[in-house]
C-alpha cells in the first residue's frame, strides 16, 4: 500500500513539474504568434496593417534587410505567385537552443497549401521567414 501511495505522489509531482516548465514556452509562443499573425494580416487582404506595425516585431538585421519598399514588393510577389489568402491556421511551435520556429499552414486561391514558417530569436523578434507551397501527392488512377 505504501508503494502505491509513493508512486501516486511521484506521478503527481512529475505532472506538476511538466506544467511549470511549459509556462515559459506558452509565453514565448503567445508573443511570437502575435508577430506572425501581423505578417499573415499583411497578405490576407483587408485591412492591411501598416509596415511600421508589421516590422515592430522584426529584429535589427531583418529591419535592415526588409524595408518598406522590399516588403511591398514581397506582398506583390506573394499575391502573384499564390493568389489571395483564404485562410491560415496555426500548425507547429518548435523550440531550439538559439531560435524558435512557428509554422502556419495557409490556403490561397492559386495554391491549396502553403507552409508559412517564421523563425524567432530568444528575444521573440522575427529573424527570418519563408513561404513554401506544399505539393500534395497525386492520386493514382484506378485500374
Feature names for model-found ranges:
Residues 7-17:
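Bacterial N-terminal signal peptides
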Amino acid at each position: 500500500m505504501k508503494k502505491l501511495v509513493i508512486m501516486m505522489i511521484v506521478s503527481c509531482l512529475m505532472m506538476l513539474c511538466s506544467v511549470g516548465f511549459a509556462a515559459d514556452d506558452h509565453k514565448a509562443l503567445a508573443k511570437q504568434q502575435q508577430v506572425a499573425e501581423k505578417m499573415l494580416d499583411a497578405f490576407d487582404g483587408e485591412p492591411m496593417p501598416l509596415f511600421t506595425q508589421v516590422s515592430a516585431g522584426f529584429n535589427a538585421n531583418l529591419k535592415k534587410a526588409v524595408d518598406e519598399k522590399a516588403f511591398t514588393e514581397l506582398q506583390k510577389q506573394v499575391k502573384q505567385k499564390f493568389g489571395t489568402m483564404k485562410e491560415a491556421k496555426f500548425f507547429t511551435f518548435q523550440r531550439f537552443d538559439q531560435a524558435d520556429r512557428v509554422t502556419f499552414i495557409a490556403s490561397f486561391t492559386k495554391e491549396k497549401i502553403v507552409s508559412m514558417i517564421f523563425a524567432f530569436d530568444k528575444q521573440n523578434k522575427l529573424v527570418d521567414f519563408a513561404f513554401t507551397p506544399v505539393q500534395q501527392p497525386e492520386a493514382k488512377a484506378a485500374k
